[in-house]
């Protein structure tokens, strides 16, 4: 199956790399210079210029959201599948792109490593549903939300939380350095714990995981009490809410 990615930014590149092992990926951009890095990685590239035919193609919209109107004037024909990663662009806004099936999704840059968590929503006509899931699950875990209004919050959890967790990882590694570890060793331990904890959380409720690690009067519960004292729970919950509120403005 051929997939045409319209855009050449960080997300377009991440998806192209994540998809290349299973699909034939063609990256479409404004100029050869902007596509040079992807071309050097072996991807086929095309220029859309003042007009570009999307007839019967499977396309992924990965350009800047503000460019949607201008791109709609350039694109000709009717796409087969149109998958959009454009922030704050719902199905109604995307109707300016002619396609048989439209899907909105919010992957994150971990798509490059096939580790993205991608919430998505598509028109409920059943058409091409399996193919859309196959495409999105190629670069990680694809999660279909029940209705389109849930995409804003789901997008925050998948797209913004990596930044929140990066702060956590950096803080934990700094704590290790404060206690005497070399920076590289501390960072490696933290990244490893993130990976192993993620696997545990797939089959275990967070509270049960925490309780399984905390021994009475032990070292872990001492640290947990310190986190609770500083309002760690409300800080993270508030961060999600603030990002959500910003996304729907």
Predicted segments, located by residue:
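NAD(P)+-binding Rossmann beta1-loop-alpha1 motif at the extreme N-terminus of oxidoreductases
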Residues: 1-50, 54, 58, 115-116, ...
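Glycine/small-residue-rich loop that forms an oxyanion/phosphate-binding "nest" at active or ligand-binding sites
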Residues: 51-53, 58-124
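Residues at the starts of beta-strands that form the adenosine-phosphate
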Residues: 2, 24-25, 81, 101, ...
């Amino acid at each position: 199956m051929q997939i045409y990615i319209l855009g050449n930014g960080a997300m377009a590149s991440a998806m192209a790399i994540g998809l290349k092992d299973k699909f034939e990926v063609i990256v479409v951009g404004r100029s050869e210079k902007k596509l040079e890095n992807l071309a050097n990685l072996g991807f086929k590239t095309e220029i859309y210029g003042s007009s570009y035919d999307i007839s019967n193609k499977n396309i992924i919209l990965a350009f800047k959201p503000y460019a949607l109107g201008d791109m709609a004037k350039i694109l000709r024909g009717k796409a087969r599948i149109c998958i959009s990663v454009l922030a704050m662009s719902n199905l109604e806004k995307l109707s300016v792109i002619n396609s048989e099936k439209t899907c909105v999704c919010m992957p994150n840059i971990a798509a490059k490593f096939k580790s993205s968590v991608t919430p998505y929503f598509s028109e409920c006509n059943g058409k091409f549903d399996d193919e859309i899931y196959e495409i999105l699950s190629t670069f990680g875990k694809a999660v279909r939300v029940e209705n389109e209004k849930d995409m804003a919050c789901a997008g925050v959890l998948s797209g913004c939380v990596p930044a929140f967790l990066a702060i956590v990882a950096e803080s934990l590694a700094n704590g290790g350095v404060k206690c005497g570890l070399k920076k590289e060793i501390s960072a490696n331990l933290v990244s490893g714990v993130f990976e192993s904890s993620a696997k545990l959380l797939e089959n275990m409720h967070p509270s049960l995981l925490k309780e399984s690690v905390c021994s009475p009067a032990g070292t872990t519960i001492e640290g947990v009490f310190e986190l609770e004292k500083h309002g760690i729970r409300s800080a993270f919950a508030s961060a999600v809410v603030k990002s959500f509120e910003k996304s729907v403005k």
